[in-house]
């Protein structure tokens, strides 16, 4: 090796060593995260299930991450203002979103100023609950088979209550009517409570309710409960059968919630948030809070960030088909 060649090799080695040293001096994103308080953006007002989940989960995640977790309720625009804020936030993990099934339905219901799937990445699924199909006490049917047979006989005379155009209760009602092959009279209400009130009063026939809204009335035998929209029975309603087990395969319907970060958030940061979420979802206080509102935590096998992203993708596709087939429009 001549002198010039030896000099080039030596300089290359020195430059490589310097670069390695500089890279080693730069801490990985996961080593410095979080460097300030984390904001969980909630698209709904305080007091609802999404806000409640954000607060109890955020408190436990704060202890794991060693930084404060701030809950910020950003309402309006059918939850699009909050979602858009996180989509356009700095992708560093310090501003994240908690949302529920509506984030998937909104893709087909609204003209969005962002691309939901391209703008967000999953951190992890949080909790879920099936719906429960209930009816007025005087409905001449006991059990799903009799109820759906009555729907076929009655047709447009069926007064099917729901909690507002585009709500999960509406989507559930549309999917049931579609699977039974009948056209019914869909009656919108401003939320679940007034819908259930009219079921109790006998002014409406059937309603697809959240368990938390109807469980006390079911246990008091004030209304009929035909099935839960799940593969298995609910522990809180052990006497109410599973719609899927009864043969209604399409009626596997979950109200679910998940955490999302802006697209482009470094994988180590997403993983750090996911690890904190996993710890939170094993905390007895968190689990009790969920149970008190009729919710269950997702199991450990469903908690990977990719699973949350896949859930969003699948739900967007599923509800797009129902919304378009039934010409459902968002509430004005």
Predicted regions and their residues:
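An extracytoplasmic/periplasmic, membrane-proximal ligand-sensing/linker region
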Residues: 35-37, 267-332
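Short, low-complexity disordered leader/linker segments with a strong preference
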Residues: 1-35, 145, 331-332
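Short beta-strand->loop
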Residues: 115-126, 161, 183-187, 205-206, ...
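N-terminal (or domain-start) structured segment
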Residues: 25-118, 157-159, 165, 181-206, ...
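Short secondary-structure boundary segments
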Residues: 100-101, 137, 211-212, 230, ...
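Hinge/capping helix and adjacent helix->loop/strand transition within the periplasmic-binding protein
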Residues: 61, 88-94, 107-194, 243-245, ...
């Amino acid at each position: 090796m001549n002198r010039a060649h030896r000099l080039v090799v030596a300089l290359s080695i020195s430059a490589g060593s310097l670069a390695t040293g500089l890279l080693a001096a730069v801490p990985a994103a996961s080593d410095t995260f979080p460097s300030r308080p984390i904001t969980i953006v909630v698209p709904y007002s305080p007091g609802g299930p999404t806000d409640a989940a954000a607060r109890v989960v955020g408190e436990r995640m704060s202890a794991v991450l060693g930084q404060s977790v701030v809950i910020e309720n950003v309402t309006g625009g059918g939850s699009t203002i909050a979602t858009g804020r996180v989509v356009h936030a700095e992708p560093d993990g310090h501003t994240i979103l908690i949302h529920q099934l509506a984030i998937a339905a909104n893709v087909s219901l609204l003209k969005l100023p962002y691309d939901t799937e391209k703008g967000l990445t999953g951190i992890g699924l949080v909790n879920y609950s099936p719906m429960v199909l209930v009816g007025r006490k005087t409905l001449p049917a006991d059990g799903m088979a009799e109820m759906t047979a009555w729907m076929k006989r009655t047709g447009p005379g069926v007064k099917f209550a729901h909690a507002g155009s585009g709500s999960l209760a509406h989507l559930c009602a549309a999917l049931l009517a579609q699977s039974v092959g009948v056209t019914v009279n869909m009656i919108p209400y401003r939320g679940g409570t007034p819908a259930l009130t009219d079921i109790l009063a006998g002014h409406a026939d059937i309603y697809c309710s959240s368990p938390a809204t109807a469980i006390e009335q079911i246990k008091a035998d004030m209304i009929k409960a035909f099935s839960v929209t799940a593969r298995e029975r609910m522990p809180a309603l052990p006497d109410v059968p599973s719609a899927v087990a009864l043969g209604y395969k399409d009626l596997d319907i979950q109200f679910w919630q998940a955490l999302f970060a802006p697209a482009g958030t470094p994988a180590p940061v997403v993983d750090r948030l996911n690890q904190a979420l996993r710890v939170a979802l094993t905390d007895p206080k968190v689990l009790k809070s969920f149970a008190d509102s009729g919710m269950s935590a997702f199991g450990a096998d469903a908690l990977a960030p990719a699973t949350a992203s896949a859930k969003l993708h699948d739900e967007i596709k599923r509800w797009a088909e129902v919304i378009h087939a039934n010409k459902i429009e968002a509430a004005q």
